[in-house]
């Protein structure tokens, strides 16, 4: 039975556990364990490769380098998210000695790779060089990588500073030394990749001598090889045969470089000391000032090369040197049929690839549109909910004090946000209009589309289309929705809009609606909710901590679940009243941090946003009768009707 509302029907404070966000170090809970939905979440990279090799399923992977600026870091993380949609098996991040690569700077190799794993859910290889580094430095970098959740290292010697190679006293001089050290110090924790040179390393005495060095690296513990770029398939085929003859049996992945510009080609060739075939030079030289023409030629060349490699049966996958660009590589993969935007999701929310989160399969619904924030606020947990959220009075969410961490920043710059949300606001209705335009996809009066809100930096989720008309109607009237889901009763898990999990299952949802609204509307809503008491769970809270709910105090409400062959029921999304009090701090702060601070202090626009922050309520509603038609729209309609109904005194005044 649903509990009676705690708090009065008018909006008086009920402050128990309401205002503080806390920052305890771990979540104390005992969790039921359920079988994982996605086997790849529990496999290390070399196991994923082995399974693909056995099945004949080709993979692709992508290389990126750390950006030079903070803005570049924000853009690169956005690119990770976009390119993750195509299904890379892994990415790798290069090690730039000049850029303080092991530091906590947002442009460091370590931080970019950590962000890819933790916040983008990408299996990631971190390059690491031993050139000009002491043993203690290298070991420290490896321990830090492990602590950040990185499990794959590409062990490289690195390029010398200047033209001449100088040995480092107390350090390592060759990649094989680094491989041996990783295995000696960390055992089997890391999967190790090493570089192969299809034409031999430019500093090697001979091709055969270089192959012997490669064999030494594999014998020391390397799990697979990624090659330097090359331009002709026969170069790779000869290399693979030579490796086989040498007794090298691990996977060898060819490195592919789609030519994207004349200057980038010259720079890469200079660094790699490779010779470009004359027939390629003959094509590029006349069009060297036409970037589009060179890019198109590079795409055609890469597609042809990849087709020849794949047809040989010698290639387990393809590794692309992207130069931090996406267009050419994406186009090549699409033409090869390897870019697969599978709408199916292992779970309804974005995954992290950190090893300690591999069992995680339950989250509160509130962070559905801010998964990176949720991961940040729970990064100190020692274990993660698996099977059920559980009863907990202390979810221990870390505080979100810095809204400008590069992986949490809006992808849109200030100028673009002002064009979307308004250079100047004149009333609360101006704010309502922004929400409506975000939902409708129509441009504002200045011709700019609203593609994000402070609570959602992405386009609308596919399932929002099922509720679009209702959402538009209520947002026009000051019910400012930031999260919603329709009720679902047994849709196939393969459904392209609401499906998730393995095939052959069925998914279910309770209708959910979360929104900001004025105090007057909240008071009317509470009056209406009395007649829905046994069906609808509600929770209203404002920035001051006034808190009214009819939900059981410490009891989460499962609002998404799935039934799959041979498995227990999975409940990946809950509405948890305790977590909601932590979420409300973040949700209210976003009014100011993301929107209000776009305007000058004391300006009318800033004042309007501040008023909403100070006076509105954050509300969530759950319709527990998921097999029936969603009643939440009727609840809202009844509320608006009550709000607009003339008062008794007004009617008496108007009477003749």
Swiss-Prot record:
Changing residue 68 to G: In MTHFRD; reduced methylenetetrahydrofolate reductase activity; reduced affinity for NADPH. Its cofactor is FAD. Changing residue 372 to E: In MTHFRD; reduced methylenetetrahydrofolate reductase activity; reduced affinity for NADPH. Its EC number is 1.5.1.53. The modification Phosphoserine is found at residues 9-10, 18, 20-21, 23, 25-26, 29-30, 103, 394. The active site is at residue 63. Phosphorylation of an N-terminal serine-rich phosphorylation region increases sensitivity to S-adenosylmethionine and inhibition. S-adenosyl-L-methionine binds at residues 456, 461-464, 481-485, 560, 573. It comes from the Eukaryota. The keyword Phosphoprotein applies. The modification Phosphothreonine is found at residues 34, 94, 451. It is an enzyme of class 1 (oxidoreductase). NCBIfam families: fadh2_euk. This is Methylenetetrahydrofolate reductase (NADPH). It comes from Homo sapiens. The gene is MTHFR.
């Amino acid at each position: 039975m649903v509990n009676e509302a705690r708090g009065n029907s008018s909006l008086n404070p009920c402050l128990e556990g309401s205002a503080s966000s806390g920052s305890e170090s771990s979540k104390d809970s005992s969790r039921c364990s359920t079988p994982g939905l996605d086997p790849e979440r529990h496999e290390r990279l070399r196991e994923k490769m082995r399974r693909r090799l056995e099945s004949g399923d080709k993979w692709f992977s992508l290389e990126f380098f750390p950006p030079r600026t903070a803005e570049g870091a924000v853009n690169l993380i956005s690119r990770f998210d976009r390119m993750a949609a195509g299904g890379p098996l892994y990415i790798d991040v290069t090690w730039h000695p000049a850029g303080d690569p092991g530091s906590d700077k947002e442009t460091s190799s370590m931080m970019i790779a950590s962000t890819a794993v933790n916040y983008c859910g990408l299996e990631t290889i971190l390059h690491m060089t031993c050139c000009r580094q002491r043993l203690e430095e290298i070991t420290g970098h490896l321990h830090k990588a492990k602590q950040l959740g990185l499990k794959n290292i590409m062990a490289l010697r690195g390029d010398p500073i200047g033209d001449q190679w100088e040995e480092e006293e107390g350090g390592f001089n060759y990649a094989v030394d680094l491989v041996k050290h990783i295995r000696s110090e960390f055992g089997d924790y890391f999967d190790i990749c090493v570089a192969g040179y299809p034409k031999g390393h430019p500093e090697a005495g001979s091709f055969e001598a270089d192959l012997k060095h490669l064999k030494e690296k594999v014998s020391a513990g390397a799990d697979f090889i990624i090659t330097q770029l090359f331009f002709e398939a026969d170069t790779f085929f000869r290399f693979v045969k030579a490796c086989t003859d040498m007794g090298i049996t691990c996977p060898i992945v060819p490195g592919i470089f789609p030519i994207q510009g004349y200057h980038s080609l010259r720079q890469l060739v200079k660094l790699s000391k490779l010779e470009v075939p004359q027939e390629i030079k003959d094509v590029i030289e006349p069009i060297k000032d036409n970037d589009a023409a060179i890019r198109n030629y590079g795409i055609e060349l890469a597609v042809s090369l990849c087709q020849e490699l794949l047809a040989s049966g010698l290639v387990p996958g393809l590794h692309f040197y992207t130069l931090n660009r996406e267009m050419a590589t994406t186009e090549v993969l699409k033409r090869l049929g390897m870019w697969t935007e599978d709408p199916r999701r292992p779970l309804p929310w974005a995954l992290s690839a950190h090893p300690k989160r591999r069992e995680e399969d339950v989250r509160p619904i509130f962070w559905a549109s801010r998964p990176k924030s949720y991961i940040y606020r729970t990064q100190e947990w020692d274990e993660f909910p698996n099977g059920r959220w559980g009863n907990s009075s202390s979810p221990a969410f870390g505080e979100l004090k810095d809204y400008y961490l590069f992986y949490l920043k809006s992808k849109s710059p200030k100028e673009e946000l002002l064009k979307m949300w308004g250079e100047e606001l004149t009333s609360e209705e101006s704010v309502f209009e922004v929400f409506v335009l975000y939902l409708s996809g129509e441009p504002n009066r200045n011709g700019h589309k609203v593609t994000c809100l402070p609570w959602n930096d992405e386009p609308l989720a596919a399932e929002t289309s099922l509720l679009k008309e209702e959402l538009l109607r209520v947002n026009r009237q000051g019910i400012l929705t930031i999260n919603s889901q329709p009720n679902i009763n047994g849709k196939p898990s393969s459904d392209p809009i609401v499906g998730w999990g393995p095939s052959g299952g069925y998914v279910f949802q309770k209708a959910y609606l979360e929104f900001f609204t004025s105090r007057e509307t909240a008071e009317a809503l509470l009056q209406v909710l009395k007649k829905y008491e046994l069906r609808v769970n509600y929770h209203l809270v404002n920035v001051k901590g006034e808190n009214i709910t009819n939900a059981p105090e410490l009891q989460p409400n499962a609002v998404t679940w799935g039934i799959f062959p041979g498995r227990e029921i999975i409940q990946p999304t809950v509405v948890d009243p305790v977590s909601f009090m932590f979420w409300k701090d973040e949700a209210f702060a976003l009014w100011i941090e993301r929107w209000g601070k776009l305007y000058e202090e004391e300006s009318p626009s800033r004042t309007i946003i501040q008023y909403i922050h100070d006076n509105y309520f954050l509300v969530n509603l759950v319709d527990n009768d998921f097999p029936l038609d969603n009643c939440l729209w009727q609840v809202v309609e009844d509320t608006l009707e009550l709000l607009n109904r003339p008062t008794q005194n007004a009617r008496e005044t108007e009477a003749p």
